[in-house]
Design a protein with these regions (language model features):
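A generic structured-segment signal
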Residues: 4, 33-34
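N-terminal secretory signal peptides
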Residues: 1-14, 39-41
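N-terminal export leaders
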Residues: 14-32
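Signal peptide processing junction and immediate N-terminal pro/mature segment
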Residues: 34-44
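N-terminal alpha/beta PP-like core and its mobile active-site loop of ThDP/TPP-dependent enzymes
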Residues: 24-27, 43-244
């Protein structure tokens, strides 16, 4: 399916052959028309230029979210998140909407996704994952797209049983999410941040969870290229037939 779409978008496959390929995969005639109609608009508009940057892990994470159109981040505060707040203070395009408790912040992100139809972003302390899970269950049942990020103890000294920390909060979060991951390499900060938003927002929607250890969030001198997400967005909504 992926190769078929790429050939069509790259104009190496005709509309007729692309439709025949979809039909061979089991798509109905109406589904074929909807997919072809959506892809026909995928390359409209100017292609935004990528951003080559160097900064902390948190600055890379924030720049990646902004490249995906994120302007609101919900969450609470904690010491382990301080590198991210430093990154927020250096810009004015994205705002942090704070709550006094993680369960409330989760409900705010859930409501934002339901009202706006956009993937919500939630950033909470790793020690507050149990509080987050209380209301994340509701978002999971509603199939609400929420990219949940959390901090964590440094991965350079694992197994120290840090204060109020569990070595692995991913396993309990797996029950109420589509996908969980811990970023242990600075080269994957942008990649996994993008993937979190993409997986959460891909139908059927649902929460995802990505954990960033403190040394990854605060890592200096991270070099990367941030690509605007609209360059890769392909509409997948079913288009109605005007004649019907």
């Amino acid at each position: 399916m992926r190769d078929l779409i790429k050939q069509f978008v790259d104009q190496r496959l005709s509309r007729r052959d692309f439709g025949a390929g979809l039909a061979a995969l089991g798509f109905s005639a109406s589904a074929v028309q909807s997919v072809v109609g959506s892809l026909a608009h995928a390359d409209e508009g100017p292609v935004a230029a990528p951003l080559r940057m160097e900064g902390t892990g948190s600055e890379v994470m924030l720049a990646t979210l902004q490249a995906g159109g994120v302007r609101n981040i919900f969450g609470t505060t904690a010491t382990g998140m301080s590198p991210f707040f430093d990154a927020l203070a250096l810009q004015s395009d994205t705002r942090m909407i704070l709550s006094i408790a993680e369960s409330q912040a989760t409900s705010m992100a859930h409501g934002y996704e339901l009202a706006s139809g956009e993937t919500a972003v939630l950033f909470v302390p790793g020690v507050a994952i149990p509080s987050t899970m209380n209301n994340l269950y509701n978002a999971w049942k509603d199939r609400s797209a929420i990219a949940v990020f959390s901090d964590g103890p440094s991965n350079q000294l694992p197994g120290r049983d840090a204060f109020q920390q569990m070595q692995d909060w991913l396993e309990p979060m797996d029950r109420f999410t589509k996908w969980v991951w811990q970023v242990d390499n600075t080269r994957q900060i942008g990649e996994m941040t993008r993937r979190a938003s993409q997986v959460a927002g891909t139908a059927p929607g649902g929460p995802v969870h990505v954990r960033f250890p403190l040394n990854i969030l605060g890592a200096p001198g991270v070099r990367t290229t941030v690509y605007p997400q609209q360059n890769f967005h392909v509409p997948v909504e079913m288009r109605p037939k005007p004649e019907l």
